[in-house]
């Protein structure tokens, strides 16, 4: 048999795996093979001999006193008197090891070992792929549609060598049906990795176009200042297909974060909006002062004042600004609440008209120098 260390090195190189991880799985495969061949009730151990570079597999028995009930209840123990028949020098508490050579056990044993090795190496590959893609959650990917279910509820994709899917809830539904997400087999779709699932069948990647992370990823792809870390997306909230709000921070006073994201004549923000089926994107500058943040997040409405009371923001507006503050179907006030983390309560205030006396004074001041 080829030296086990050579086999481990070969598998590690071929599968691009860490040799230490492969070694661990190979030892596990040998132990599982022993349990299949001889029974799980026995204790087995294995290690790789540094001199021969081969694996040593053995059954282990712990020496106990002749009157110890463990010897009758478990096959992992042997009485002292029986142990001395094998080795006169043993004492209670010692371990006796029986070497097992799977090669000497015939074709069935070799086939069992081969299956165990394949099973454990495939599991290792799945785990590494899972770790790799799980670390990419929130990242933008391009995926090709391979099939669509009969009711158009789920899209299926090829992503590198893995399979992905996108349920209907993860696709953008616009107020204008003509703008909503519609894909056919063969289409290339931009989305983010929302979740990575692993089971005995393999790895399945859930994609999404409705997550706020998708908007953040698109902005990073369109705006160099975000990609380079000069502008940070501090908060992001979406009502997919309708409206979104993004709060930005510039790490340098020389950078206008809103101008950087909007782009010349709106080219950058329009490109992102187009990918989001025409979703309107409000861009504001983040502030650590809650009153300022709420005021900015309520745009395009003009706010008279804001009072913060624990988790609630009391927003005072003129009646003329109420419809803008609420937004179509409540989108503006909902997004403001999502991005600021405050419950928004609107209060109308009466516009104060100048008195006749004040109006006369203002008029006189205009003509006093004539």
Role assignments for model-derived ranges:
Residues 1-370:
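RNA-contacting regions in translation and RNA-metabolism proteins
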């Amino acid at each position: 048999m080829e030296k086990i260390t050579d086999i481990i090195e070969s598998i590690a190189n071929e599968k691009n795996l860490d040799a230490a991880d492969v070694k661990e799985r190979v030892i596990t495969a040998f132990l599982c093979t022993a349990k299949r061949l001889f029974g799980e009730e026995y204790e087995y151990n294995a290690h790789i001999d540094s001199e021969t570079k081969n694996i040593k597999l053995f059954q282990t028995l712990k020496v106990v006193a002749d009157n110890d009930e463990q010897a009758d209840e478990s096959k992992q123990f042997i009485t002292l008197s029986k142990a001395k028949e094998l080795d006169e020098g043993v004492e209670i508490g010692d371990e006796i090891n029986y070497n097992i050579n799977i090669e000497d056990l015939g074709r069935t044993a070799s086939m069992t070992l081969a299956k165990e090795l394949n099973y454990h190496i495939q599991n290792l590959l799945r785990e590494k792929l899972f770790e790799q893609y799980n670390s990419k959650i929130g990242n933008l990917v391009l995926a090709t549609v391979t099939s669509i279910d009969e009711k158009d509820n789920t899209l299926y994709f090829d992503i590198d060598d893995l399979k992905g899917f996108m349920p209907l809830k993860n696709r953008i539904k616009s107020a204008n049906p003509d703008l909503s997400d519609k894909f056919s087999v063969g289409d290339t779709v931009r989305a983010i990795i929302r979740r990575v699932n692993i089971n005995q069948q393999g790895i399945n990647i859930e994609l999404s176009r409705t997550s706020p992370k998708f908007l953040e990823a698109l902005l990073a792809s369109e705006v160099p200042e975000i990609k380079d870390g000069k502008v940070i997306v501090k908060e992001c909230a979406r009502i997919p297909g309708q409206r979104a709000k993004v709060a930005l921070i510039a790490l340098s006073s020389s950078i206008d974060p809103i101008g950087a994201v909007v782009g010349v004549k709106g080219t950058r923000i329009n490109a992102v909006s187009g990918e989001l089926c025409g979703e309107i994107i409000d861009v504001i500058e983040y502030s650590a002062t809650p009153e300022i943040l709420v005021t900015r997040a309520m745009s395009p409405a003009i706010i008279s004042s804001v009072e913060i009371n624990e988790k609630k923001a009391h927003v005072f507006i003129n009646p003329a600004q109420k419809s803008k503050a609420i937004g179509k179907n409540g989108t503006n006030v909902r997004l403001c609440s999502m991005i600021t983390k405050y419950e928004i309560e609107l209060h109308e205030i009466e516009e104060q008209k100048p008195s006749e006396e004040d109006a006369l004074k203002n008029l006189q001041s205009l003509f006093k120098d004539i």
